[in-house]
């Protein structure tokens, strides 16, 4: 059994650790003009060609909820194929905000995303890692935690992301819970959530309610994720259900 002096010593050391504040660099403001690889005419031709594909070929949505939503929005829906008037597309694009504030557990590390802000985030999804002896290893949850801690400590990194490496020592059925908890626990910066299914996305939102409070996340952005379409021109129910949860 530890003595009172030992317990006080541990408490003092913990207090000292908590006093150390990890500063984060602000987002990089892009003040240099963008490189323009195409002239105005080429941009207009590409824009017209892409809108022609959406109008004439369309996109498949393997999701009944999405199909109903597109009908209500005014798109031409036949079966699972949706075709879009270019006026509708431009109207929807115009409704997207130029920037949003992504709130972190530490309010001082919240980020403005968009505008001329450049944000630096760890890569995600690595199936292997390499140790100092150049051995290729299967990542574990402990490895992921270490990467999240490094992301927290590095001033130039603005987010802990989510599965920087894939923790292969945990089953896929609950891996997303471990990944999200590690992101939340080991860094107070912004983080990403798992969108590998609608159910997984719901679990992430429930965890965000615990961390930030249900009322807060109703009106503030606290987590982001990414979804991917299938080639060519197909969206499936798995990705779209996750998108709806995060929206």
Sequence positions of predicted segments:
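Acidic/polar, glycine-rich intrinsically disordered N-terminal extensions of enzymes
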Residues: 1-143
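Helix-rich catalytic cores of soluble enzyme domains
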Residues: 138-247
């Amino acid at each position: 059994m530890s003595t009172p002096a030992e317990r006080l010593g541990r408490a003092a050391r913990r207090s000292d650790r908590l006093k150390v504040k990890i500063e984060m660099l602000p987002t990089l403001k892009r003040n240099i003009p963008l490189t323009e690889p195409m002239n105005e005419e080429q941009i207009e031709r590409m824009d017209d060609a892409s809108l022609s594909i959406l109008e004439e070929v369309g996109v498949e949505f393997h999701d009944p909820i999405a199909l109903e939503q597109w009908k209500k929005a005014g798109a031409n829906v036949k079966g699972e194929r949706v075709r879009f008037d270019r006026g509708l597309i431009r109207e929807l694009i115009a409704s997207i905000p130029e920037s949003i504030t992504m709130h972190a557990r530490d309010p001082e590390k919240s980020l403005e995303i968009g505008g001329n802000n450049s944000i630096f985030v760890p890569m995600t999804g690595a199936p292997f890692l390499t140790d100092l002896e150049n051995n290729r290893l299967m990542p574990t949850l402990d490895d992921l935690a270490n990467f999240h801690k490094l992301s927290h400590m590095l001033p130039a990194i603005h987010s802990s992301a989510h599965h920087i490496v894939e923790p292969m020592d945990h089953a896929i059925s609950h891996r997303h819970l471990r990944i999200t908890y590690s992101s939340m626990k080991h860094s107070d910066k912004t983080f990403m959530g798992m969108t590998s299914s609608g159910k997984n996305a719901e679990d992430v939102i429930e965890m965000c309610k615990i961390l930030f409070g249900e009322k807060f996340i109703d009106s503030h952005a606290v987590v982001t994720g990414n979804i991917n379409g299938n080639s060519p021109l197909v969206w499936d129910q798995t990705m779209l259900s996750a998108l709806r949860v995060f929206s």
